């Protein structure tokens, strides 16, 4: 799957789950489970409940995603 197949949406972290997983509420009201991307994990980017994040979703499974950016 190439990067062009995925799309990004903005959301807010609603809950922190084990193993660096997060429950994110998207702007359209949907709730997805998301994990941190590799570059964010490598650079020790901390994500807390209430943070605004950008989530990358695939058209194959819209209930899971990858957090690619945390707004300041």
UniProtKB/Swiss-Prot annotation:
The gene is infA. One of the essential components for the initiation of protein synthesis. Stabilizes the binding of IF-2 and IF-3 on the 30S subunit to which N-formylmethionyl-tRNA(fMet) subsequently binds. Helps modulate mRNA selection, yielding the 30S pre-initiation complex (PIC). Upon addition of the 50S ribosomal subunit IF-1, IF-2 and IF-3 are released leaving the mature 70S translation initiation complex. Component of the 30S ribosomal translation pre-initiation complex which assembles on the 30S ribosome in the order IF-2 and IF-3, IF-1 and N-formylmethionyl-tRNA(fMet); mRNA recruitment can occur at any time during PIC assembly. GO terms for cellular component: cytosol. InterPro entries: NA-bd_OB-fold, RNA-binding_domain_S1_IF1, S1_domain, TIF_IF1. Residues 1-72 form the S1-like domain. This is Translation initiation factor IF-1. It is found in: Cytoplasm.
